[in-house]
């Protein structure tokens, strides 16, 4: 970012939400002292202290004038991290972002990369707070169709879900589409979902025939998405989550109350379906082994080596 044309330590670096606080602090340490971030109360008229991105994006899309920003100075570099996928009115949101930057300014977008999840049918990608699921091609095409020129693009790799980063400038004359790098095959469809439902139920049925109990470990959005989309609520025997705030709550879609991991101690034949954060799987397995060494593991994530679909083939009688 600091190497962009016309950007120097006197440039104004800014952000639209709390998602940019850490990176703005990094800029400050590097000598960029002119910075601002949209204030929820002063700029967006948000008075609910428990607001989140769903409220921020809606307010940004609807505000006509950012009066305080006019006084602070429009941005040379506006950073917009992990909010675009939450937008209800993405056209209006992008139009209003343009009001926050100078004519020769830049916007840095960061969104989740869903391409591999589409190809692998990784259902836990889906989240009730996300309206859009971007691939490289759809992301770039959206920006170009919205009057931006893509100055820089990068796919930043992570262990589970990659990140798409685009630095754009204003270019209202450019409305071109890139037909290259299209998603080769859309595996996310009802036909494949029905196959996957069948595979999972058959696998669980075989495990239950061997007297294994099925325990869902973790009750975050990934676990709930997996359980409900693949319709395996009725095949779960135990729900475990060590978050004290969730204990004795009922898992949505079931009549099962959430309990803690101490209840795994005396179970002989138990299958743990890991629904925790992908990066936390090894840590959780290590923790469970201290409680019960007999436990076997599967994961809700397609990228995990404990993938529940692993080695399963579709064969319906």
Q: Would you name each region that the model predicts?
A:
Residues 36, 56, 151, 259, ...:
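General small-molecule cofactor/ligand-binding pocket signal
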Residues 148-158:
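Conserved S-adenosyl-L-methionine
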Residues 1-120, 133-148, 224-225, 230, ...:
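Conserved SAM-binding loop
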Residues 121-127, 184:
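Short glycine/proline- and charge-enriched loop/turn segments
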Residues 1-7, 22, 26, 165-317:
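Hydrophobic, well-ordered beta-alpha structural blocks that scaffold small-molecule cofactor pockets
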Residues 131-134, 155:
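Extended, H/D-rich, highly charged conserved domains that either
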Residues 52-58, 125-128, 233-234, 257, ...:
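Short, hinge-like loop/turn segments at secondary-structure boundaries
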Residues 113-122, 159-163, 170:
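Flexible glycine/acidic-rich beta-alpha junction loops that bind and position SAM and/or redox cofactors
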């Amino acid at each position: 970012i600091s190497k962009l044309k016309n950007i120097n330590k006197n440039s104004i670096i800014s952000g639209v939400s709390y998602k940019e606080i850490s990176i703005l602090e990094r800029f400050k340490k590097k000598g960029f002292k002119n910075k601002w971030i949209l204030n929820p109360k002063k700029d967006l008229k948000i008075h609910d202290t428990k607001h989140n991105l769903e409220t921020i994006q809606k307010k940004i899309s609807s505000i006509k004038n950012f009066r305080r920003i006019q006084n602070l100075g429009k941005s040379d570099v506006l950073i917009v991290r992990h909010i675009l996928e939450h937008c209800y009115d993405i056209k209006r949101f992008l139009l209003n972002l343009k009001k926050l930057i100078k004519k020769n300014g830049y916007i840095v977008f960061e969104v989740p990369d869903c391409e591999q999840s589409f190809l692998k049918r990784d259902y836990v990608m889906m989240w009730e707070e996300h309206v859009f699921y971007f691939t490289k091609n759809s992301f770039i095409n959206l920006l170009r169709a919205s009057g931006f020129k893509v100055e820089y693009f990068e796919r930043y790799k992570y262990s589970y879900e990659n990140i798409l980063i685009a630095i754009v400038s204003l270019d209202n004359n450019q409305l071109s589409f890139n037909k290259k790098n299209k998603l080769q095959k859309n595996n996310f469809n009802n036909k494949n979902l029905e196959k996957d439902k069948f595979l999972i139920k058959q696998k669980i049925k075989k495990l239950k025939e061997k007297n294994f109990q099925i325990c869902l470990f973790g009750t975050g959005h990934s676990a709930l998405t997996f359980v409900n989309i693949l319709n395996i609520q009725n095949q779960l025997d135990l729900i475990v989550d060590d978050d004290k705030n969730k204990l004795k709550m009922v898992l949505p879609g079931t009549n099962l109350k959430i309990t803690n991991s101490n209840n795994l101690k005396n179970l002989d034949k138990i299958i743990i379906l890991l629904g925790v954060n992908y990066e936390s799987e090894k840590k959780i397995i290590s923790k469970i082994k201290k409680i019960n060494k007999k436990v076997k593991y599967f994961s809700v994530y397609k990228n995990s080596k404990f993938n529940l679909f692993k080695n399963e083939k579709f064969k319906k009688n």
